[in-house]
UniProtKB/Swiss-Prot annotation:
It comes from Trittame loki (Brush-footed trapdoor spider). Its main location: secreted. It is found in: Secreted. It holds the Pfam family Cys_Knot_tox. Expressed by the venom gland. This is Toxin ICK-42. One of its GO terms (molecular function) is ion channel regulator activity. InterPro entries: Cys_Knot_tox. Probable neurotoxin with ion channel impairing activity. Residues 1-19 form the signal peptide. Disulfide bonds join 40-54, 40-77, 53-66, 80-87. GO terms for cellular component: extracellular region.
Length: 87
């Protein structure tokens, strides 16, 4: 019983430390409109081109784009830190 509890605690701490795997930058502040006034595609949602995606408010720290998601067949919008190797 004790090893099972330890394993569950380890898994819980791992999820808390590493975060949810499908975040895609949705919690990073971003603009909800494109320059032409149309709504943009939010991070984590399907897209076909980068110009459809919402841009980050802090463009110097964060980058955005439309790319293929890991374990998903379609392209999605993402926002991530420019210095992150996970982007």
């Amino acid at each position: 019983m004790k090893p099972i509890v330890y394993m569950l605690l380890f898994c819980a701490f791992t999820v808390v430390i590493l975060g949810h795997p499908n975040n895609h930058g949705a919690l990073i502040p971003h603009h909800d409109k494109l320059p032409n006034g149309e709504s943009c595609t939010r991070p984590g949602y399907s897209c076909s081109e980068s110009n459809q995606c919402c841009t980050p408010v802090d463009g110097e720290t964060f980058t955005y784009g439309c790319g293929r998601a890991w374990m998903e067949g379609s392209k999605i919008c993402y926002i991530c830190n420019r210095e992150s190797s996970m982007c």
